[in-house]
């Protein structure tokens, strides 16, 4: 996608003055990432803000022992302003982001976006609206991890993946599923086996599970 076509997809584009549109155009870039590639984090520079033009990303935090906890998964048409604490200065934790599929992003650097926020009330409202939505997703994730049993979290994840893809089959390894629901690979493997014995899923070759019914 060319930059001109990408810029008009910004939710606040129509609220910018001509000079602001020119400024954004000069400071925005389109970046492509392959599946599994690091988008932000691990000591890299601040990404700024990003609009997902195609594909899907995964945002997560790392525990002290290196375990990944998935926070949210921005997909096509969605914006991400929590890609680093440098965007909203009062954020006291850093998120890491990887490309969950091949994806293309429209990226606006943090300094340029910060200038827009200070000068345009519509952009400022957009920033806090998206931040609020993301924090709601983070809180939902934390509630699941803290208060839902692993079998329920796993069942919900499998159902959501089937809804997302429109298929009754989930092609992921035990390790990948564990990362998504904040658990351990061994726990996921045992739970999937139990689901299969209960007739809820059918486990195929490595990395494939078919949902026979919703749990």
Segment roles from a protein language model:
Residues 39-44:
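Short phosphate-coordinating micro-motif centered on Lys-Gly-acidic
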Residues 36, 47-60, 75-77:
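Glycine- and acidic-residue-biased ligand/ion/polar-headgroup-sensing regions
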Residues 94-95, 114-119, 137-146, 164-165:
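Short helix-to-loop capping/linker segments positioned immediately adjacent to catalytic or ligand/cofactor-binding
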Residues 72-129:
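Cyclic-nucleotide recognition modules
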Residues 147, 151-155:
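Short, leucine-enriched amphipathic alpha-helices that occur as contiguous helical runs
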Residues 1-30, 34, 84-88:
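Cyclic nucleotide-binding regulatory module and flanking cytosolic helices
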Residues 150, 159-212:
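Phosphate-/nucleic-acid-contacting segments
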């Amino acid at each position: 996608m060319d930059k001109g076509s990408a810029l008009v997809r910004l939710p606040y584009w129509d609220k910018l003055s001509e000079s602001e549109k020119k400024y954004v155009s000069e400071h925005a870039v389109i970046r492509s990432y392959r599946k599994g590639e690091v988008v932000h984090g691990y000591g890299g520079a601040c990404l700024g803000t990003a609009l997902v033009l195609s594909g899907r990303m995964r945002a997560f935090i790392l525990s002290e022992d290196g375990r990944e906890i998935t926070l949210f998964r921005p997909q096509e048409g969605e914006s991400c302003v929590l890609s680093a604490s440098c965007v909203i200065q009062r954020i006291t934790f850093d998120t890491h982001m990887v490309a969950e599929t091949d994806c293309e992003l429209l990226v606006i650097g943090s300094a340029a976006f910060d200038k827009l926020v200070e000068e345009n009330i519509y952009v400022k409202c957009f920033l806090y609206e998206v931040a609020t939505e993301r924090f709601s997703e983070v809180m939902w994730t934390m509630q699941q991890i803290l208060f839902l049993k692993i079998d329920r979290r796993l069942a919900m994840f499998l159902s959501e993946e089937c809804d997302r893809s429109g298929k009754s089959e989930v092609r992921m390894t035990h390790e990948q599923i564990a990362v998504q629901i904040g658990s351990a690979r061994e726990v996921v493997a045992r739970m999937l086996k139990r689901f299969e014995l209960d007739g809820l899923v059918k486990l195929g070759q490595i990395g494939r599970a078919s949902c026979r019914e919703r749990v």
